[in-house]
Amino acid sequence: MTEKVFDTTLGTIHYWVQAGERVQPWLIFLPGLTADHRLFDKQMEGLGGPYNCLVWDAPAHGASRPFRLEFSLEDMARYLDGIFQAEG
């Protein structure tokens, strides 16, 4: 897995990808409220061959701290879209 960052005006979001060299479908893992990216370590490891995989530490969770608590669910969707755009 490769750790990457996505900068916002409220803080930095950390996310991890496991992507192959060829074009293949993406699997996106979104940990729940009390978890971080480590929740999906085994899935990322096992599915990282036939799929591109991405997992994040949501804003204000795990490595994505500190993060100002001034964001909405709509903002989180925009952040994810920005990450998807960055990853192609």
What are these regions (language model features)?
Residues 1-12:
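N-terminal cap/lid segment of alpha/beta-hydrolase-fold proteins
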Residues 5-7, 32, 68, 72:
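Pocket-edge positions in alpha/beta enzyme catalytic cores
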Residues 9-11, 24, 67:
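Exposed loop/turn and edge beta-strand positions of beta-sandwich/beta-sheet ligand-binding modules
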Residues 11-13, 17-20, 75, 79:
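Residue-level detection of beta-strand scaffold positions
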Residues 14-63:
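Conserved HGGG/HGGXW glycine-rich cap/lid loop of the alpha/beta-hydrolase fold
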Residues 54-88:
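Active-site loop/oxyanion-hole signature of alpha/beta-hydrolase fold enzymes
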